[in-house]
Amino acid sequence: VGTGRRAVVAGYLDILRARHAVRLLVGTLVGRLPNATAAIAIVLFVRAEGGSYSLAGALAAVYGVANAVGQPVLGRLVDLHGQPRVQLPAAVLSALAMAVFAFAGTGTAVLAYVAVGAAGLFTPPLEGGLRALWPSVLGEEDQVHTAYAMDAVAQEVMFTVGPLLVTVCVSLWSPQAALLVLNAVGVLGALSVVVSPPSRAWRSAPREAHWLGALRSGGLLALLGAFLFIGMALGSITVASVPYADDHGGDAVYGWLMAALGLGALVGGAVYGARRWAGEPARRLRLLVALLAVCYLPLMLMPGAVSMVLLTVLAGVFLAPCIACAFVLVDVHAPRGTVTEAFSWLVTTFTVGASVGTGLAGPVVEHGGALWGFAVPGAAGFVSLLVLACTGRVLAAPARGAVVAASSENDPNRAVEPRFSSGHQA
């Protein structure tokens, strides 16, 4: 056990020792704080202004939809024009729009909706940009895939810590200050990334002019279809946990359940990224999604609070490994010159899926209770597995003109031949 633990730590330390790695990872996480905290910050601000929960939910939904639309569009612009020219202006515009919302309040509904929508639309695609940078920073395929797992784990930590930071800002100052401070900090994070040498040097490979961009890849479309349902599973758990918590201790239990879900993903991602995996990534993803779906099923037992927390940890274990493995497949299937856009589409699809899952689980819980609410994630997980099974051939074969990790996508000289292929180890 001690040897395995040392191997886990050593694998991640090797990544963090690489030049610029810590700066890029931390800068990206800080830069994404506004996105990770937007929903709760908007709700708390609207309520403090005297607005209704319906208005708060509607504004948060507008932010989410605008963000889902903006990520792939901005990702395509990054591929065309480079990271600094797109990421920093987008971050500034997003922060300014949120500042307009913070100072104008909800008195003029139209202005509030426009400001929140603009903030979501211009959220910079830092997540996709970081994944495009890892090959040029690390160079070795195994390290790139470990970095993807570390990246997935870091995102789980951020989305767990982010809401806590909002509550701290609100308790120290006000909901308005929380909006302003977190978005200002987000701009600093984006600035830290785009002025770094890897970000300034990165150039996308030449791309074929096509209005579909990354979506012309059948393999990427199959992956997006599968992750739409994985997002639905995650979103439905957050809703189904509410009535369960109401019957077993209230808000404190709900907080423990959400923390347990994040803890499971953190542990699973850390262990997954610490070893080298042989075989086809597509086949491994099918196995991981199958395990993810199976681990959702015990939630329907709805035992006491302590046991339920443990089951929720189990439910989260395979989430980060699924995401990390999907990153590898995005590398394989993204058409040349579209890597940032392709990663942004994965983020968008997962986010949209979570929103759909939240919306679907609401009526299910209302009519059938928490039991049927917890049936939704298991069902969504198995539908995701079905999508992967039906598209196995497409996912197993890289698309024509696809870019793999550490290919010319990250070569300033735009060499034609990639340095290695994802087909042997991932």
Task: Place the predicted regions along the sequence by residue.
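C-terminal transmembrane helical hairpin of 12-TM major facilitator-type secondary transporters
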Residues: A282-A326
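A late C-terminal transmembrane helix in Major Facilitator Superfamily
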Residues: G337-A370
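Intracellular juxtamembrane helix-capping segments at the cytosolic ends
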Residues: P124-L138, S241, P321-A334
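Hydrophobic core of transmembrane alpha-helices in multi-pass small-molecule transporters
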Residues: L29, A109-L126, L228, M308-P321
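Helix-to-loop junctions at the C-terminal end of transmembrane segments
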Residues: G70-Q83, V170, V267-P281, V365
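Cytoplasmic helix-loop-helix junction between adjacent transmembrane helices
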Residues: A115-V157
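Helix-loop boundary and gating motifs at the non-cytosolic
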Residues: A7-A66, A214-A259
